[in-house]
Amino acid sequence: MSVDVQRITDFIWYVNSIWMLPIQIFSAIYILQKHLGLGALAALVTTLMVMACNYPLTRLQRNYQSDIMNAKDDRMKATSEILKNMKILKLQAWDNQFLNKVKTLRKKEYDCLWKSLRLQDFTTFILWGAPSLISVVTFVTCMLMGVKLTAGAVLSALATFQMLQSPIFGLPDLLSALVQSKVSADRIASYLQQSETQKDAVEYCSNDHTEFSVEIENGAFSWEPESSRPTLDDIELKVKSGMKVAICGAVGSGKSSLPSSILGEIQKLKGTVRVSGKQAYVPQSPWILSGTIRDNILFGSIYESEKYERTVKACALIKDFELFSNGDLTEIGERGINMSGGQKQRIQIARAVYQNADIYLLDDPFSAVDAHTGRELFEDCLMGILKDKTVLYVTHQVEFLPAADLILVMQNGRVMQAGKFEELLKQNIGFEVLTQCDSEHNISTENKKKEAKLVQDEETEKGVIGKEVYLTYLTTVKGGLLVPFIILAQSCFQMLQIASNYWMAWTAPPTAESIPKLGMGRILLVYALLAAGSSLCVLARTILVAIGGLSTAETFFSRMLCSIFRAPMSYFDSTPTGRILNRASTDQSVLDLEMAVKLGWCAFSIIQIVGTIFVMSQVAWQVCVIFIPVAVACVFYQRYYTPTERELSRMSGVERAPILHHFAESLAGATTIRAFDQRDRFISSNLVLIDSHSRPWFHVASAMEWLSFRLNLLSHFVFAFSLVLLVTLPEGVINPSIAGLGVTYGLSLNVLQATVIWNICNAENKMISVERILQHSKIPSEAPLVIDDQRPLDNWPNVGSIVFRDLQVRYAEHFPAVLKNITCAFPGGKKIGVVGRTGSGKSTLIQALFRIVEPSHGTIVIDNVDITKIGLHDLRSRLGIIPQDNALFDGTIRLNLDPLAQYTDREIWEALDKCQLGDVIRAKDEKLDATVVENGENWSVGQRQLVCLGRVLLKKSNILVLDEATASVDSATDGVIQKIINQEFKDRTVVTIAHRIHTVIESDLVLVLSDGRIAEFDSPAKLLQREDSFFSKLIKEYSLRSNHFAGSNDLLS
């Protein structure tokens, strides 16, 4: 999306060279034939041989480029996954491990780059040496064939070879660009040819042709069509208009796959799916777009105030809007980073409701909201504003089942039971498991109220790129020691080239009858030696540039990578992933393959033009007179052009990141976009962003043409003046042969002048990538990972006591305090429940405990150790946590359980058996090496959460934190998790952000937070004795909701 497209775009600059090069070569051969006769055949044969050598080299280079792109893909995929889950890595103290993973992938990419550059060095050596080789072979052939090499013939030949130099010298870049663009085009073509969603998976009917809104007949569906076991099988379903259908079942039973089959997202193996009416979809994992809350709710629809207010009220968002300074116009960070899980869930429910669809597919819509909000959502939204709509909702919360017209109980991908709530209870064949102790209600989620702008605009430099940027780049490797050697090698090449041509012009006889000054054999031997020396200088120069450029790129990458990994979470909250990925892909690619070459070309072209001016001034010093005003004009044009081009290039670079960001967001929400039939709108938005990027880029190209035209005019003027001067000089003033040599060099002057300015501007353009990478190499860092003189004991924390003393936390100096004067103590080995309304500060307390945010005042002491005095790795690696985001990483089950490779297979299997995943993993052919795709999409949400449980079972920390860890799993799985935690962490400290009542009641102590302060802190029993306590009110609220189940449960006895 970034590098491949950019390479194809860059190739446009070289398109004309493809057809111009053969014309230039054959035109040169024709001119040679006129002056050297049959000797020109030698030039033709040698040229064809050089070109033939390029064919195998080009094929090999294409393979290397393909390897580079594959290695880059692996690195970028890992980088993207890490950036999305950086909070998990920091909480688990895995950041160093995953940093090393990216470094390993970069090492693989580096090896591929080095192979490619070595081959490119060899290709450059051949092609830059080609003009000299062709001239030597041609002159030797002429000598052997008896062709007289007069001064006129030699100068004509040298002029022809001089004309060939520029296109042949540019051939390595042309071939490199051709190969890179071909590889990129093939990769894009391969991507475009991949299979798409089945277009005939769902039959859409009008309401007049069927009485059912949703109908599935003999359906079988699979996420992996090649698997012998379908994900869903024998599905028979008929849903009439206006019905409310609840879907429940255990973890991995196929609950979420059923709505996907109705949407056509899962591969249909057999059967028929018919849908009548407009659909709206709410996924299990909230998908939130960057932008305002209102934009997310409207989702492209027209704003209607009355309809909007009804929607917002039905989705219980009024109070949330009051928490924000800008209400529903508050900006949402990337992936809703500054919103709680409950808020994100309600926003996407509001998005669905506002669409006024006929059919609503809600995948676990109540899991992330508190008990009070859940009741409001169900009554006001599902049974209120959507009362006449067809609704299919997945849920594991049994209190929402009795109101359903139909309940589907899923097991192993099949509908095992179907009917109304009372009917299923009477059947007494397993449904009652879902109703056991139905105390699984959410109490609250967390919100971080921030007044300032969350997502910061990209910082761009203004004006001239600072000298320190150039200096940093040039001196990064060995203090810049390679730079003078590179310039020396190019200078030697230029001097040897001039010397060889001067030698031929000076020694060649003026006429066929004249006697040469030296024997022709000796003349050609000296010429060949000088040409060989110049070719060796080219080889030395290309090797030094490759070594210096790639080493510098690697150093810059390493610094940027370490800087990003050590950045605090506030950086990731305010910086879109697309912006960081743009640095790690497009900008890093410039450093890898282009930056050193572009800077080198600047030096080379300047040295070439200095050499040309030197030769012309040796012929007639008067030529220098015209060079002075021309040089002034060139500098004027360059200074007039460069600032414009530089700012346009910066604008183009800045506009590229939103394209990547929008593409990534669209990819993540593709199912929702298709369900809402919003594909055209997102494609249009993407095209608008592409236009915004292309607009400044087009002006960059136009400005370049503007400059080239004026420089060419100046060059032709200088050349014309030189010719007139040489013709008008009196006879005998200068050697005619040397004058001819001056004219020969003057022929390339117009190209060289344009090349110098173009290379300077192009290098400055590419230097912007260096500037941006340097910005990301200087991100303020977190506290040190390890402080050697403050390291805790190996068995710390052995008691598990946690003491908060006057703790205050704010997310930035200009943000309001989120936690205010928190003072309390969690005794070691006790179970602590933390509850509170939205925005009370629960999750912030946990983040402060792990130092994801640093206290602005006060201390946190664990087992008599002030955690702000020790290293972050020492702190985080000693604490265990099951976070709300159950992230799995691309790889295997083994990698996800034990990324640090600390445990044996036996210990891993024990942990899997304890968390009820042992049999599931054993059923896989790969066992512990079973595949986990990106984000763990091939595992259910519940299974992902059990894997997270397996991690803490292996870690065996004396302090365990549960941050709404079971919000998205069914009652049975939640019971399993609670049972395991009670058994395995019996004498250890467990801090639970409570989302279900029974986890709080069974705690030893309950901490109630309100508006960032401690409202209550005592045992559940004592809090319940106080009827006015916040905790008592929560229990009463839950009891009122649960009373109507009592009668139903009696049917089971």
Curated annotation (Swiss-Prot):
State which residue ranges cross the membrane: 11-31, 36-56, 125-145, 151-171, 481-503, 523-543, 595-615, 714-734, 738-758
Q: Which residues does the annotation say bind ATP 1?
A: 249-256
> SMART domains per the record?
AAA
The UniProt record lists the keyword Membrane: yes
Q: Where in the cell is it found?
A: Membrane
Tell me which residues bind ATP 2: 836-843
- Function field: Pump for glutathione S-conjugates.
- According to UniProt, the name of this protein is Putative ABC transporter C family member 15
Q: Which gene encodes it?
A: ABCC15
